[in-house]
Amino acid sequence: MTQFPLARFCLITLILTVLSLLVTAAEPTPDSTAKVNFEKEIAPLLVHHCIRCHNPGNEKGDLSLATLQSIKDAGYLTPGKPEESYLLDVIHTSADTGKAAMPKEGPPLKKAQIALLTRWIKEGAAWPAGLTLQEKSKADLSWWSLQPLAEAAPPEDKDAPANWQTSPIDRFIFAKLKEKNLKPAPRATKRELIRRATYNLTGLPPTPEEVAAFEKDQSPDAYERLIDRLLAFPRYGEHWGRHWLDVVRFGESNGFERNVIIDNAWPFRDYVIRSFNEDKPFDQLVIEHLAGDVIGKNDPDVVVGSTFLVCGPYDNVGNQDPVQAAQIRANTIDDMIRTTGEAFLGLTVGCSRCHNHKFDPIKQQDYYSLYATFAGVRHGSRVIADPQDRQAQTQKRQPLQTEKAELLKQKSAIENTIQQRAEQKSAAYEKEWTREPAKRTGVEETFPPVTAKYVRLTSQGLDTNPRAMTGYRVDEFEVWTADDRPQNVALARNGGKATGANSRVAGDFAGAYDVGLTIDGKIGACWIAGSPDLTIELKAPQTINRIVFSSDRSGAAMSNYKATFLAEYKLEVSTDGKTWQEVASSHNRKPVSSSHRRKRFYDLEVTVEERSQLNEFNKKIREVDRQLAAIPDPPSWWVGHHSQVNGPFHIFVGGNPQRKGETVVPASMTTLNKVTEGYKLDANSPQGQRRLELARWIVSKDNPLTPRVLANRLWYYHFGTGIVSTPSDFGYMGTKPSHPELLDWLSLQIQKNDWRLKDIQKQIMLSQAYQQASNFREDAARIDSDSRLLWRFPPRRLSGEEIRDTLLSVTGKLNLKMGGPGFRLYEYLQDNVATYVPLEEFGPETYRRAVYHQNARAARVDLLTDFDCPDNAFAAPRRNTTTTPLQALTLMNHQFTLDLSRFLAARLRQDAGTEHVDQQIVRAFQLLYSRAPRSEEQQAARALIAASDLEALCRAMINSNELIYLD
């Protein structure tokens, strides 16, 4: 009998935990005369007791029971020799303990079962070729969402109100209401309908003029024409594009600990908005999202669609450890797989990364087939231009580049001559350099005592830093008195004042490197010079004899990329700030680096004539550079890099890239094998073809998931609740549809309409279900508390973006500029990691629609964040709606809303006249609430204005529920 060490024995004690069966069967009854039937007797036993903990994705004890070969490779089974098969040892009851090692958490196997396994091994352990055992998920291929679309006839019911018998949508809805003895609500008022429809399609309030015109229009098709107008309005794409950006987790920073801005991701946002406005077929959108670079190589409007795969968070630290780097790469592709599965198919495919899905029929093999599909996709930017544009640009640039190269060649010849002369005299120069070079961590200069009211540091030369973006830096600047108890009289707390221009890197905070940091007495924060001079004014004239300054006293930021190093300087003092006396300089210090050494030689040796010649060359080169800069670069967009990555591709055991299991190839998911024709590609197939085949499979006519998920999303965004209330999970852990026949009817309508969305949206909005009032009825709520069955229109609070856009719209400040780079509601500082600080002041550049905000991950934006705008580190297929004290405080006290209260008051005075208080009140109610004030409201508003002012009324109305809730 083969013996195993105790440690391995302990590992095996995790085997045989009870699972649901892959092959449903009763406990086998052995027949001692017939040969053991593996599929009927052994497979059910292993699946029922063992496979959960011992499968390719979860090899506890380094054992997988999925295939005969994997059991043999682990050393647990020797066909024909049960006495040498350790598998039998762990399931036998021990004479010492009276227990079997396995199964650990369940009852021991029966003697008949052990005898059956023993016979099977003795007979040679027959195992059908190609058979792999796997655990059974809670939902199988018969799950409702995996079935073909069923075209059910809309129910007919003569008891339904006449206006509910026309639309198929209403007939489906009414049938469910009747089942629960519920009745629909009456039709909403015209004011409620135009407000509901306008917000629903555009995310903006209707204007008072639009409300008045709609209420006045008594024609039968007035409401239909309203919907047609709103669907054609450019604001439609902005609002519905925002919904889709939530689903695809679009963000404009990379997330993780560095979280740096991605400044060129905005073309994807514009592409999404444009696609919705143009009513682009959704199947085409899916293909462009997954393979836009494949089908539209020379069409930027198509290529940009493939940003979908790389618009999520990713770790860009660039870990040098190969194990960690492989894990980061696996996490990056996991984001693509999860988003693809959830956005288009409503399947939580990511749950099968480490093992077969516990709830849905998604194999780990399916996950890694998708992994192979996306293996060639990496985050990054690339130039987007068609060949003609590239050629035209090359023709413009080439002669200028040739001219510049010749100028540089002539300039270099002069510089080389100067450098050669300088090297010949280097020994003589170096004799004069007797002191140690200046150091970043500190420079000390002493000199005979001198009286000073002002002290000035002047840069005379910098050590070259090819990555420098700004001037030199000063951490601390100290001026010490010449007495028995020296004091640093430069300190701000001792009355010192610092003067000097700051240098800012684009995106830094104002004051991030302020000159005052040189005398704050704190090591670390520094001034980055925007001018050669730093001047310190002392509180009173002092006798001084020592000055100390540093670029980086702590030594923690010596490789800082933003600043050069002050290598040459002079120090001067003055009593009046006009006449200056030099007290120290670096003229006799050694160079700080080899590049600085060459520069000093060069400066000492260059003649007046040579300097003049070089200046002339520099002037000509700058002119050529100016002309080159005037030629616009082809756009570089965040669309990802796509490279060929060939197989073999493996399942990662337990999700660990270091533990490679069975091989896989790019292929469709087996989840839909019964209803949709699948595909399987070679491991070395072109990487673009893999993504294109996946996209075509997702939108194939027999795939029931994609249209169902899409139809449900449309329903959710119109009613605030989906037919399936988990929009991105149509599996076992999601909810089942409240109206399954209606969902399939909508799905088929989408397909019949060539995947265009506006027509089905119009049908939804023309339904009586959509046009119901939102009045609460206690009896109905007891049966259907959240109105999923639609006995009324579910009221909702506006989203954070809608609230912000509404405030700007009613004040007349909304900037409707479409497209292009976004604006920021935060200040952005990048110094290896990024920091985002919400703005405290808001100018016209921030008054665009919120969809154009540069939506950085984890960047808190008070109003938007407080009103539940999601963190786009994750997809947000369904937004949460919370009610918190912070929301009321933000609307009442935030600088943005205070500004808009003033703007609104100014608009009311302009629209209604400065002296007509009652007209101002009426106009305010029309703008904010789309109605006239009631008499008691008019009186209360008049009293508030009299007691305070018009701004107070505006502030109060902005803080009302009626503004931010939609009936």
Per-segment meaning from a language model:
Residues 431-623, 688-693:
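Aromatic, loop-rich ligand-recognition surfaces of beta-strand-rich domains
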Residues 75-78, 873-880, 945:
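Conserved phosphate-binding loops in nucleotide/dinucleotide-binding enzymes
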Residues 936-948:
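Helix-loop-helix junctions that connect adjacent transmembrane helices in secondary transporters/permeases
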Residues 22-292, 357, 377-437, 442, ...:
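Aromatic- and Gly/Pro-enriched helix-to-coil junctions and flexible linker segments
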Residues 49, 59-61, 83, 140-142, ...:
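Residues that flank catalytic or metal-binding motifs in active/ligand-binding sites
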Residues 1-7:
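N-terminal secretory signal peptides that target proteins for export/translocation
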Residues 168, 172-177, 275-277, 285, ...:
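An acidic, gly/pro-interrupted, aromatic-rich
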Residues 10-21:
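Bacterial N-terminal signal peptides
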